Amino acid sequence: MCGIVGFTGNHQAAPILLDGLSKLEYRGYDSAGLAVRDGEHLSQVVKAKGRLSNLSEKTDSGKALKGTCGIGHTRWATHGEPSQVNAHPHVSGNCEKSGSGTVESEVVGVHNGIIENYTELKEKLLKHGYTFYSDTDTEVVIKLVDYYYKKYNLGPIDASAKTMVRVRGSYALELMFKDYPGEIWVARKDSPMIIGIADGETYVASDVPAILKYTRNVYYIGNLEFAKLTPGEAHFYDLNGDEIEKETTEIKWDAEAAEKAGFEHFMMKEIYEQPKAIRDTLNSVVKDGVIDFTDIDLTEEEIKKYSQIYIVACGSAWHVGVEAQYVIEEMAQIPVRVELASEFRYREMPLVKDGLVIVISQSGETADTLAAMRMAKEKGLATLAVVNVIGSSIAREADKVFYTLAGPEISVATTKGYSAQLVALDCIAVQFAKVKGLITDEQYSYYISELQTIPDKIEKILQDKERIQWFAAKYANAHDVFFVGRGVDYAVCLEGSLKLKEISYIHSEAYAAGELKHGTISLIEDNILVIGVLTQSKLYEKTVSNMMECKSRGAYLMGVTNYGNYEMEDKVDFTVYVPKVDEHFMGSLAVIPLQLLGYYVSVAKGLDVDKPRNLAKSVTVE
């Protein structure tokens, strides 16, 4: 949530900053701003409410701001309403123009995160003569830096360190000091930040896509660390002011993967990239026909000792966990608990000491998931992270990491990230079953080969997208939609429902089909859309029966089922068929039509598919 960028080098900064912010729009925002400095001249600050295009227009696409050092920000309101006044950057001076224009301030900065004790700090600063023009916690932090900088006559190192010790909460902070032209100072705690290095130029961003166009060599700044950035160099420090040695990491992602490549929206592009994401993820662990977790550092001895698995995640990643629970418990005969990270971290619950906590996060920065993992580690449990971003906070702190190879995912609504996570958990299920002696060599090979057929079968489903597009246009004005299924199909329904509601703004809910009669069926009325997922042969007739109850009350029925279940045509009003794969893995196929449905409904309604209202791609605050 929020996005930060920074640049110091030889080129004009503002166009680079605007380009970087455009690559972070998926994180969600309500306003944006830039601060650019030309040599020893004072910083120029420009801010705008609303879309990034408003800021671009104000600055003539950045050409109106001269200077080779600058910082930028897209804001998601947490303290103070969305407005130009509350937009970042903020300044340390007592400014009457909401911090815009040429600023006579010692410190200019932007911040991503939440400062929990900002009220206390604000009262302190008021007593020392500071006044405030905004309602934000960020202005408080900038003025706290200024306070230490001036009062103790400190340099940026000590002023930054004292500020970091004093504040409570999360932050990724960028600062420019009037007395230090060409330098950007950054600090981090629990909010994402990467630093990119190229020839004579240095970049800062919340996420990789913002700088991928310019460099692949990045530094990861650790918790409670700060850094001085100059053109082409970065120097890191701990809270004591001692310098820390770091090495760069090369980002392997293709720069073009962060572009639309001819698709109207990132979401559709990423739907089409799912076969590759799954192939790449499978190929990273399937070698010579067997699953090899050597790179994850997960040994057979460790697998044998785990008696309980906890899967902890948020949003779509939690849906992956729900589906994986069915597969792992049936295959590997290990009890699995699936927990929402935002609940798990606050529960006083007994945890099995020889349990394994699997945390799932596409970004590797999800605040609640990160906090839940830390809690599990404090209690002595082993942790395995399934993440997509190399070097992310969760990846760095987990005991073991299974990287999904989905590449950058820009659309807020996850598709390929979800699918890569799901196949990763399927691999874990198969390997655990094999190591525990619960499946034969023949079954093991069969399951692996079935997983390897999924990419081609997804491509076949995508060939039928026009029928789903037609159906989506027909129901684009629906007010309520219900998804029903059992077992793995229920998990698919959870994800399908979320896809529809988050990008089309239609109220939708997913229910275990057997629960309809326990209250939900009272909501069924004429022409309400009920979507059933029916891929599990043992549960097929039960779910059909539940759907018929809905039809008898006037519902319009859509069914998603396997090729071969052609009697479905006589029972529901619209049927989507998907290829067959082993039923443990059917969720990877059944979810595709539901992704397409959500996408096409949103398009039919003329909505912003990639950046739905009120949502952020990476939820990095609690």
Report each predicted region and the residues it spans.
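Glycine-rich oxoanion-binding loops at beta->alpha junctions
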Residues: 72-93, 285-300, 324-360, 366, ...
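Active-site phosphate/pyrophosphate-binding segments
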Residues: 274-278, 282-310, 400-529, 602-622
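Conserved short alpha-helical segments that host acidic/polar catalytic motifs at enzyme active sites
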Residues: 1-260, 264-265, 276-307, 346, ...
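Generic C-terminus detector
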Residues: 241, 556, 569-571, 581-622
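Glycine-rich phosphate-binding loops that contact phosphosugars or nucleotide phosphates
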Residues: 304-446, 450-453, 533-579, 597, ...
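Hydrophobic alpha-helical scaffolding
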Residues: 7-10, 111, 131, 135, ...
